[in-house]
């Protein structure tokens, strides 16, 4: 089973999204965060269950979607590294994944 590791930027991005949703719907924000963590935890057993990125099909990155979010990750040996979280309606820029986001 792979270990799940969240980068600090990914956690910050998730927190920003949840804080924004919580302004109007605190319960919905809490449920979203819970569902995202649950979905990401399953990657520990099934790291290849995410999808290739349509914007960068030949990259090492994959994604899982929990509406309204996209969660980007890559697998390194026995580690699934969560590197970026964004809302679905935002456009992914290739340069975001070219930067080492681990801090």
Regions found by a protein language model. Name each.
Residues 62-64:
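Short acidic-hydrophobic surface loop/beta-edge motif
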């Amino acid at each position: 089973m792979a270990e799940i590791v969240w980068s600090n930027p990914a956690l910050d991005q998730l927190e920003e999204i949840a804080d924004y949703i919580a302004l109007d719907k605190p319960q919905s924000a809490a449920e979203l965060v819970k569902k995202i963590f649950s979905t990401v935890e399953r990657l520990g057993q099934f790291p290849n269950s995410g999808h290739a990125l349509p914007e960068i099909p030949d990259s090492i990155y994959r994604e899982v979607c929990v509406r309204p979010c996209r969660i980007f990750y890559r697998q390194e040996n026995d580690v699934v590294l969560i590197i970026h979280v964004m809302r679905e309606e935002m456009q992914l820029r290739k340069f975001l994944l070219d930067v080492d986001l681990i801090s």
